[in-house]
Amino acid sequence: MARVKRAMHARKKHKKILKLAKGYYGRRSRTFKNANETVLRAMNFAYVGRKLKKRDFRRLWIARINAAARMNGLSYSKFMNGIKLAGINMNRKMLSEIAINDEKAFADLVEVAKKQLNA
């Protein structure tokens, strides 16, 4: 069987992982095995966190829209149904920004939604 020489590749891999583990406490930043486990775990947490961030922001936008809509006498679900019926195609992020920064414009949107629900 032929001899496999892989020192350069292994060193490159180890250096890459140890560089990623810089700043970790104790042996986690100095030995390849511990650093590798910690880096893989950290990358997994980062991956999951990127998915959770999308959910968290959507929940925040809905809570803001709901609060602003209720201040104008309409629940979130009725407000969203009303603007859909009115043909206003605006995402929740934009609606929440309008609710925070321009209360008069949001009140106008609520009035449009109310008219569509009553029609």
Curated annotation (Swiss-Prot):
Claim: Ribonucleoprotein is one of the keywords in the record: yes
Keyword list, A-Z: Ribonucleoprotein, Ribosomal protein, RNA-binding, rRNA-binding
Gene3D superfamilies, sorted: 6.10.160.10, Ribosomal protein L20
Record's keyword annotation contains Ribonucleoprotein: yes
GO molecular function: rRNA binding; structural constituent of ribosome
One Gene Ontology biological process: ribosomal large subunit assembly
InterPro entries reported in the protein's UniProt record: Ribosomal_bL20, RIBOSOMAL_L20_CS, Ribosomal_protein_bL20_C
A Gene Ontology term for the protein's cellular component: ribosome
Any Pfam family hit: Ribosomal_L20
The family this protein is said to belong to: Belongs to the bacterial ribosomal protein bL20 family.
Known role: Binds directly to 23S ribosomal RNA and is necessary for the in vitro assembly process of the 50S ribosomal subunit. It is not involved in the protein synthesizing functions of that subunit.
Name the record gives this protein: Large ribosomal subunit protein bL20
Organism for this UniProt entry: Clostridium novyi (strain NT)
Lineage of origin: Bacteria, Bacillati, Bacillota, Clostridia, Eubacteriales
Name of the gene encoding the protein in the UniProt record: rplT
